[in-house]
A protein has these predicted regions:
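Active-site-adjacent helix-turn-beta-strand microarchitecture at beta-sheet edges
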Residues: 143, 148-265
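S-adenosyl-L-methionine-dependent nucleic acid methyltransferase catalytic domains
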Residues: 1-151, 233, 240-406
Length: 406
């Protein structure tokens, strides 16, 4: 059912928030022509088979993670099969896991998506170093498995900005007239060619077993622009300028996206909340504006909020009423900024000072008169909330809180 009074737009393939069993909802979406084969990106952060129950900051029950072993693997496999059918032919899926089940789920993903469509095993630093008392190395990482539905997929390579130190180390030369930093690279490549790139240029033949990277006419144009460096022995090399570089290509180890609760910063309080900048990287890399993004375990709604911020449409699913309530709070109050802070700030609510019970939508500020971290408020109203019986009755309190907060 569509919850009455909650939809504020919600075109057939627009933003949708579902409350219920994601297996049943994914199955239903297979019959929706606006969704099947139209999802450009899937990100899921499923339970990690911890056999634990999780609570929010206010001690509200959030969800249980009680599956393990073969039952857990089958639970994920069933959902991956449906998610593959919902993906577009050029779509991608990212599955976020920890060390317990990542290896088992990779085998399942090889089966469902094909081993040739495996792209990356991404290692993410999730927290600060730990002082472990047990005999093992500190567990500070988790993993993201990146697969695509086919060899042709949307991909916008992410880059990190050059630091001054690294730029000076890799681009070691400075062009005197302009002050531009550059490095020198060969203008030849392996392999013999008998066309234009195999002919002499300026009286120089390519080195044995090699060919010029560019035809002689292109090399002439480059030289006329000052882009060829000639050594004292007459050896030509190409100048590559730092200011023409897009940045440092991102690799498969991500150190900058620790979880919010490991950064002592203002968050929603949901136990599995992910860093918004992590989702920004994934969404920007594997989708375009207007594309449909799906999160089948949407939790605190980070994926949905970031997708809206970046101009994507989205579908979010969760079977926890606390999760849906947290999503609505986030939609009403906006994303909080991520960042590192040297000094710990104990977060308390204004209501806590008066001994009143906290609510999901209350205003959280820092204690001891420290100003609250500025909020990047972006209210999200263009979505529809769907809940099937018998689930819908559990949402009443959260819906009413959300509507009062608008």
């Amino acid at each position: 059912m569509l919850w009455p009074g909650v939809s504020a737009g919600g075109a057939p393939a627009g933003n949708r928030l579902y409350y219920g069993d994601n297996l049943l909802i994914l199955s239903d979406l297979l019959g929706d022509d606006c969704v099947r084969g139209k999802v450009r990106l899937v990100y899921i952060d499923p339970p990690f088979a911890t056999q634990s129950a999780f609570e929010t900051r206010s001690q509200s029950h959030a969800y249980e993670d009680l599956l393990a072993g073969a039952n857990y693997v089958e639970y994920i496999r069933e959902r991956l099969i449906f998610l593959r059918e919902l993906l577009s032919s050029d779509g991608s899926i990212y599955v976020h896991l920890d060390q317990k089940m990542a290896f088992a789920i990779k085998i399942i993903m090889d089966e469902v998506f094909g081993s040739t469509n495996f792209r990356n095993w991404i290692t993410r630093k999730k927290c600060n170093p730990k002082n472990y008392t047990r005999k093992a190395y500190g567990n500070v990482s988790d993993f993201i498995l990146f697969y695509t539905k086919s060899p042709r997929y949307v991909w916008h390579r992410p880059f990190r900005e050059w630091t001054a130190e690294r730029g000076a180390r890799e681009y070691t030369y400075v062009e005197k007239p302009t002050g531009r930093r550059y490095k020198k690279v060969p203008i030849h490549a392996p392999g013999v060619r008998h066309g234009e790139t195999g002919k002499p240029w300026r009286g120089l033949a390519p080195p044995p077993g090699k060919h010029w990277q560019f035809p002689p006419r292109t090399l002439e144009e480059m030289d006329s622009r000052g882009e060829i460096h000639w050594s004292t022995t007459g050896n030509p090399r190409r100048k590559i300028y730092l200011d023409n570089s897009k940045g440092v290509p991102v690799q498969d180890i991500w150190l900058e996206f620790r979880d919010p609760h490991n950064q002592n910063i203002k968050i929603t309080g949901y136990p599995t909340e992910k860093n918004p900048d992590l989702l920004r990287r994934i969404i920007n890399a594997s989708s375009d504006q207007g594309d449909l993004v799906l999160d089948g375990f949407c939790g605190s709604g980070t994926t949905l909020a970031v997708a809206s911020e970046l101009g994507r449409r989205w579908i979010g699913i969760d079977n926890s009423p606390e999760a849906i309530g947290t999503v609505l709070r986030r939609f009403a109050r906006g994303l909080e900024p991520m960042g590192d802070f040297v000094r710990r700030q104990r977060l308390v609510s204004k209501r806590a000072r008066t001994s009143e019970p906290p609510t999901l939508f209350e205003d959280w500020t820092t204690d001891q008169g420290v100003p609250a971290i500025g909020s990047r408020v972006r209210m999200i109203r263009d979505f529809s909330l769907f809940a099937s019986e018998p689930y819908s009755g559990e949402l009443k309190r959260y819906i009413e809180d959300w509507q009062r907060s608008l």
